[in-house]
Every structure is written in C-alpha cells, then in structure tokens.
From Swiss-Prot:
Protein name: Phosphoglycerate kinase
Localization: Cytoplasm
Any Pfam family: PGK
Keywords recorded for this protein, A-Z: ATP-binding, Cytoplasm, Glycolysis, Kinase, Nucleotide-binding, Transferase
Positions bound to substrate: 21-23, 36, 59-62, 113, 146
Any GO MF annotation of the entry: ATP binding
UniProt organism field: Francisella tularensis subsp. novicida (strain U112)
Amino acid sequence: MSFLTLKDVDLKDKKVLVRVDFNVPVKDGKVTSKVRIEAAIPTIQYILDQGGAVILMSHLGRPTEGEYDSQFSLEPVAKALSEIINKPVKFAKDWLDGVDVKAGEIVMCENVRFNSGEKKSTDDLSKKIASLGDVFVMDAFATAHRAQASTYGVAKYIPVACAGILLTNEIQALEKALKSPKKPMAAIVGGSKVSTKLSVLNNLLDKVEILIVGGGIANTFIKAEGFDVGNSLYEQDLVAEATEILAKAKALGVNIPVPVDVRVAKEFSENAQAIIKKVSDVAADEMILDIGPESEKRIAELLKSANTILWNGPVGVFEFDNFAEGTKALSLSIAQSHAFSVAGGGDTIAAIEKFGIKDQVSYISTAGGAFLEFLEGKKLPAIEILKEKAIR
C-alpha cells in the first residue's frame, strides 16, 4: 500500500481521530440499519486494544452547513454504537474547542456538517479539527471522493494520517478487481442512466472481457441497436455514445450482451403485469422494466466463465416483485460463481439483501459515489492526501 495503515502506527496513549461513515437511516430517534456502524467496529476495537483514545467523526444526512438541526444529530448513532460495542460512548455536541477523552474511551462528535467550512475544507476548520488529536484515521471510503475538512483537511494538518481497517480492505478488494484481476473479468453496470455511468463504461472497456449493461442503461443500448423501446426510460442524446461503446467493444473483443428479450408493462407500477417480449416486439405504449429469461440465460452462461466479477447496479426494477426476476437471476449467478466478486452501490446492496446472497459475494462496498469514481479511474482526494503524508 502506498499509504500508512492503522497497523503501521503507534497508538498507545494517543488521541486518535477517526473519520467513519455513520450516515445511517434514523427513524423516531432510532437507527434502523446498523451495517455501516458494524463495519467500523474492527478499527475502533483495534485502537482501544492498542491503548488509544477514540474520537469519532461523521456526517449524517444533508443539513444546512453551519446550522444545528436535531433531525440530523448523531446522538442516536452514539447510542447504537454503544449497544453494538458494549461500551459507553460519550457524545460531544460542541467539540471543536477540545474533546475530553482518555485511553480506552470512545467519544462520538456531533455531525461534522454542522460546522461552517466542512464542505470547502477551509484551513481554519481543518486546523481546528487536526488540533484535537495526535493521529488521524480515514475509515470512510464512501466520502473519500470529497475533499472536505473531516476527510482531507484534517489529514493535511495532523502529524500522522493513515487508513483504517475498513478503508484498507476496501481499497485492496477494488485494486484486486481492477488493477490485477484474474481473467476473464466481467463487469455488470446497471441503473437508470447512461449519463452517470458513461465514464465508468468507457474505463471498464479496457479492463474486462464481458460488460453487462442493465436497467435504463440497457434500454439506451437496445435503442442503439436499432430497436424501439416504447415508453421506456432511456437517453436519446446518448444513443450515439452507446453505439460508439458497442463498436469499441467489438474492436477490443469485449462481449456486451445487449438484452434480446425483456419484461414490459403498460405502466410503472408494482401491480403491473409483466409481459415477456423480444426486444423487436416492444410496443409504443410499453415500458421495459426488466430483462427477459433468454437474456438471463445468456448472462448466466457468460458469468460461468468469469474469474473476477464487478457489480454495480441492478438490471431491472427489482423493487417490484414482478420485475425482479432478472436481478434475482443475476444475483444467483454471482452467488454460484467461483469468481472473486466485488459489489457496490446502494441499489446493489439492496438487491443483495433482498435475494439473500450477502455471504456469497467476496466483497461488498458500502460506498456509492466513491465506488463509482474509483471505477472511473479517478483519484480520490482523501486517499491521495494519505499517500502524500506517507511520503513526507
């Protein structure tokens, strides 16, 4: 690794500032999904075991920066963490002027976005945060693509900055899949829009043997192949771009199995009847909401040959049971595969949970935007600053 990891750093009697991703759903003052909190436990526990004091920072939701708003308070998260780790967790509402914490203790700071200057990573705020600790640990991959005070600025000004256990595992899994994949490699890119994933598709073309498109993205590719998509979600202005990607894939020998059959409906509704049709038969008043059984079989066959699988996005509107078959079949193909598999993004995680394949995916990334930017080949500011600090 080109940056320091938690295990490279002396933590005894040190105040350790940890940027975690505790942006979790809270309803009626209770945390409703603890996945992200649980993911941070190994880092927190390691610091405590090494004799350090833990100061946790995170954002929650999108409050107006610089203003306190009780609905975005991290106090319920501190309580949830205390229950999970079975230790007291102090809560610091006003923390920028100093945090009272001793070795073996945990403090959860209030939402970083209540501080003016967080998003722009102002020097004043960054220096103030850095002065609270001796060591900074970045463990929130989900925010690594943002150069903010609690992810980037603090690392710049604190004496020692390193990656936490979760972040280290995340980068290792993604690098294994993207930089040194065992071939053949397959990538699944689904979701509603080509525009948000265009650079991902282009970047992956040079790395994969199989590129599977799904959701609204697939509709744009179906249109690029000359078929009408009726009332389906697609992007007319990107049809030419999709045509170029298909041509480039052909030249590179990359297989893009554009759906040959689909499940359509007359309306976008949970109760709509799913009708299976060839792509050439989609009527003007119909919308494509899932891939069809023939397309499922083609994908399953292709994935059997893969040694590395990267998955971002569903292939249909899996939230509606009538249009979940394609994503379910894809999930089961990945679950049954011997390949090293990495999955990421909110919808992908929801699909993994819905179809119960969590234990069959090699690595599940909790990140959304950062996961996509990594797939695009972009540099992530919060990772880059850790690399710079390691050289100094």
